[in-house]
Regions:
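ABC ATPase NBD coupling module
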Residues: 65-81, 110, 182-184
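Short coil-to-helix segment of the ABC ATPase nucleotide-binding domain corresponding to the Q-loop/switch region
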Residues: 93-102
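Conserved signature/switch motifs of ABC ATPase nucleotide-binding domains
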Residues: 132-135, 153, 185
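Conserved ABC transporter NBD signature motif
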Residues: 56-64
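Catalytic Walker B motif of ABC-type/P-loop ATPase nucleotide-binding domains
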Residues: 158-161
């Protein structure tokens, strides 16, 4: 699903990533760990083609990102699910609309968009909040909505950048268990986090970045 070959990313004189190589197979659940500033967000931005590496090769979902024409990037991103720390919900639209509008944007019919939005809000257990606005629900519920939105196109790969950074430990563990369920359904999941305590909640391997270098490959403990 993801193959990264000797990727380096520089911003002028600053090197954000140095000689990164790894592989994530289809159906895996992998954590990307490291302290703030280690390069996690930079690597994720490369994976969803928000930026290009300075050198090296990235193959994601069978596509070479370095050679992908710019006009094909939106279609490529529809094959991905993206979840962010700050939710990125539309504040003046309801919870339901925040999910359903994605379907309309990618070409689903109105009926299909409504159906999938209802199913996904049930999946993440916020269907009872569907007609509220983002400001009227908790941070944990907003993150659940953002996950439902990310799943609207039935992505094969889900990328999450510090998805629990604004949540308390209990809500964070709930979000991790949702990701686990998504992975169990066949979706490849990559979660970037600086919170080492989260890794044991799902029990998967972890790629660890330190100062822009991939230093270790760890195996997280299994959930009891």
């Amino acid at each position: 699903m993801i193959r990264c070959f000797h990727v380096t990313k520089r911003y002028g004189a600053i090197t954000a990533l140095t000689d990164i190589s790894f592989q994530i197979d289809e159906g895996e659940f992998v954590f990307l760990t490291g302290q703030s500033g280690a390069g996690k967000t930079t690597l994720l931005r490369l994976l969803y083609r928000a930026e290009l590496p300075t050198s090296g090769q990235l193959i994601v979902a069978g596509r070479n990102l370095a050679t992908m024409p710019r006009r094909q990037v939106p279609r490529f991103r529809r094959r991905l699910g993206l979840v962010f720390q700050d939710f990125k919900l539309i504040e003046d639209r309801t919870v339901f609309d925040n999910v359903a509008l994605v379907g309309l944007a990618v070409g689903f019919s109105f009926t299909e968009s409504q159906r999938r939005a209802s199913e996904l809000l049930r999946l993440v257990d916020v269907d009872g909040r569907a007609q509220l606005f983002p400001a009227q629900v908790s941070g944990g519920e907003q993150q659940r909505v953002s996950i439902a939105r990310a799943l609207m196109t039935a992505p094969k790969l889900l990328l999450a950048d510090e998805p629990t950074g604004n949540l308390d430990p209990e809500r964070a563990n709930e979000i991790m268990r949702i990701f686990h369920a998504i992975n169990q359904s066949g979706t490849t999941v990559l979660v970037a986090t600086h919170d080492a305590d989260l890794i044991g909640t799902v029990g998967r391997r972890a790629l660890t970045l330190e100062a822009g270098r991939l230093n270790t490959l760890a195996v997280a403990s299994q959930v009891s």
